[in-house]
């Protein structure tokens, strides 16, 4: 925490639920790290924070989606990181499955061993390589495309990045604010913090998982971290 410019505690009160960790965050704050707490209530850790963002219960995922949309709107997304270190360039067929080389008529020639000790074929994921203007296995791509996909050998595809953009489109600042109770200005500030204000360390707590949409909320927050 002490090496980050900002530390976000999202969905919990570390001072109560993880007392053994709380002092690290407070020591980092004393050393100059901004402490941000996103939680449903103003509790102990929030009282020690530089910025407290109160959010309606079970709407953490919505807040993350709204911040992602604002990042896209401003062109702040970490394009190189998304291209090189995430699944953003992978191609998805209309049936929701990844496009693989076997879909293009290239049968697997290698095998690997799965967790059950069985030999299974290696059928590589496909991306569109902008450098060669061709569909290639992910490992062979120089510059995988993140969008603008035409059908490949008659197969309609989209990148994961395009699907993320589509998923966050409804989450305008106003709609996100209405759902979460977080002000438009705070949503904008959160998006700016994650992308324009230096290193951010996020400590996502178990509070998000206390609702039946907890898994999806966690995935939305993780997506915010990847996009930024």
Where on the chain are the PLM-derived regions?
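A glycine-rich, hydrophobic/aromatic-adjacent loop/helix-cap motif
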Residues: 185, 194-228
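The substrate-binding groove and active-site-proximal loops of carbohydrate-active enzymes
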Residues: 7-15, 112, 173
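Glycine/threonine-rich flexible loop motifs
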Residues: 14-23
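Glycine-rich oxoanion-binding loops at beta->alpha junctions
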Residues: 1-7
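Long, well-ordered, tryptophan-enriched scaffold segments
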Residues: 46-47, 51-197
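A short helix->loop->beta-strand "cap" motif at the edges of active sites that frequently abuts
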Residues: 27-35
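Short, polar loop motifs at secondary-structure junctions
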Residues: 38-44
């Amino acid at each position: 925490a002490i090496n980050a410019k900002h530390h976000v505690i999202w969905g919990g009160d570390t001072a109560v639920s993880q007392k053994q960790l709380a002092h690290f965050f407070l020591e980092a704050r004393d050393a100059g790290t901004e402490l941000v707490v996103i939680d449903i209530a103003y509790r102990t850790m929030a009282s020690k924070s530089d910025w407290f963002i109160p959010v309606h219960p079970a709407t953490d995922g919505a807040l993350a989606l709204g911040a992602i949309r604002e990042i896209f709107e401003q062109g702040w997304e970490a394009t190189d990181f998304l291209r090189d270190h995430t699944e953003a360039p992978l191609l998805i067929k209309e049936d929701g499955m990844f496009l693989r080389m076997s879909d293009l008529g290239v049968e697997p020639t290698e095998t690997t061993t799965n967790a059950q000790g069985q030999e299974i074929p290696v059928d590589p994921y496909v991306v569109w390589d902008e450098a060669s203007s061709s569909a290639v296995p992910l490992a062979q791509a120089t510059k995988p495309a993140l969008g603008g996909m035409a059908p490949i050998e008659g197969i309609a595809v989209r990148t994961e990045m395009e699907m993320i953009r589509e998923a966050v489109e409804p989450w305008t600042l106003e709609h996100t604010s209405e759902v979460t109770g977080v002000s438009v200005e705070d949503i904008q500030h959160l998006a700016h913090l994650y992308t324009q204000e230096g290193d951010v360390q996020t400590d996502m707590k178990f509070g998000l998982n206390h609702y039946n949409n907890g898994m999806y909320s966690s995935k939305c927050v993780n997506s915010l971290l990847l996009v930024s």
